[in-house]
Amino acid sequence: MPRKAAQPSLSEQQAAPGGVGAVDRAISLLDVFTPDRSMLTLAELAEESRQYKSTVLRLLASLMHSHVVKRHADGRFSLGSTIPRLHAVYAASFSMESTVVPALRELVDATRESAAYHIRQGAKRLCLYGVDSPQTIRDHTQVGALASIRSGAAGRVFTVFGNAPAAPGARQPREPFVITPADVTREVAAIAAPVFDATGALAGVIALTMPAMRLQRKHAADVQRTARKVTSELGGRYPSMT
């Protein structure tokens, strides 16, 4: 009889409340595949998902039947032809604005400060979407504005987590967010966190700005939560900061 795994399986750790265990196990198996590890053996799938080989074989049988997974002549497995078909359906219905703007509104509701989503545009950063704080004294989010990629909390995220050139003396943060007590001016403070796409590349930056006198470090958790949510919507994963 196989021994019980020392650690719970990924499906047990990420089980959906009230969901179907077999589906959780199958999805956890698919999550093992990455751009760097697109072809995996049975042993690798079992080890990475922390499931018994016998369980993995049964899951693979169903996944191969639906062309979600493909078995190759050398015995290794990869994602199958159903994946790009489903991706095409998803891409046809996906809207960046309808994904990001509601997340920004939730962030503003939680913090009562202004929130924005920045993307890189050459040597600059562009404010693509923004939602203003409901408070009278606030930092106005100017959608369409360009700023230096080396200034402010949002710019620092691009230099630290992307491939933009860092400012002299810049250091790698220990946490997946950046706080600047004085963002671009002394009067404005900001908290920013990276958003990643399905390839693991930096897709953009969530930034929360406020009058410097209202800066609260606790809002970093709200910013990070929003960045993680948008990352998930883009099919990405947050990297480990350890």
Give the role of each language-model region.
Residues I191-T199:
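A short, hydrophobic, proline-anchored segment that marks a local hinge/packing element in signaling
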Residues P2-Y90, A221, S232, G236:
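N-terminal helix-turn-helix
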Residues P165-A170, R174-E187, L202-T242:
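Juxtadomain coupling helices with adjacent low-complexity linkers
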Residues S78-A164:
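Amphipathic alpha-helical effector-binding/dimerization core
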Residues V69-K70, Y117-H118, V195:
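A structural signal for short hydrophobic beta-strand segments in well-ordered beta-sheet cores
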Residues D74, G122, A198-T199:
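Residue-level recognition of short loop/turn positions
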Residues G19-V23, R76, G80, S93, ...:
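Short, structured helix-loop boundary elements
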